[in-house]
UniProtKB/Swiss-Prot annotation:
It is found in: Cell inner membrane. It comes from Yersinia pestis. GO terms for biological process: amino acid export across plasma membrane. The chain crosses the membrane at residues 18-38, 49-69, 88-108, 114-134. It comes from the Bacteria. Its main location: membrane. InterPro entries: Ala_export_AlaE. It is a multi-pass membrane protein. GO terms for molecular function: L-amino acid efflux transmembrane transporter activity. One of its GO terms (cellular component) is plasma membrane. This is L-alanine exporter AlaE.
Length: 148
């Protein structure tokens, strides 16, 4: 493989995209319907709109997250809590603004948006970390080499 081969990068992009689309569809719908009080139709519209958005942001988010993980490793070593905190901070800081725009575009009112984004941020204390593990699982599944 040459120095400028795009193979590993494409594999990483596909793995990151698959992980984000699947994870956000399932978790997002649960949050929107069960916690935020959105109708099933509103949530389905939101989730369907989120697919192309997630396709666009998945790989940049994967690189953003990896930068948080590398920072945590540099400053706290391989500590379990540091990696989980990095996953949490990366997920909430990147995904919350994107999520708010998706909700706004499908007609969620201000109260629903605040409720959904705030609930997502709270739930992300667990789910952002869980997404990090799911992302790493998908990267292994797609045989991505050299990720954090």
């Amino acid at each position: 493989m040459t120095m400028f081969s795009t193979g590993p990068r494409w594999r990483s992009a596909v793995a990151d995209t698959f992980a984000l689309v699947v994870y956000c569809f399932v978790i997002g719908m649960a949050i929107e319907v069960v916690i935020s009080g959105m109708t099933f139709r509103q949530s389905l519209s939101s989730r369907l709109l989120s697919i192309p958005v997630n396709i666009l942001i998945a790989w940049p988010y994967g690189m953003y997250r990896d930068a948080f993980i590398r920072f945590a490793q540099r400053h706290a070593g391989q500590r379990f809590w540091a990696r989980n905190l990095a996953d949490l901070l990366a997920y909430v800081s990147f995904q919350s603004p994107v999520y708010a725009m998706i909700l706004w575009s499908v007609g969620a009112d201000f109260e629903q948006m605040i409720s959904a984004v705030a609930s997502n941020a709270v739930v992300s204390m667990v789910m952002g970390v869980a997404y990090g593990y799911f992302l790493e699982y998908c990267r292994r599944l797609f045989r991505v080499a050299g990720y954090v």
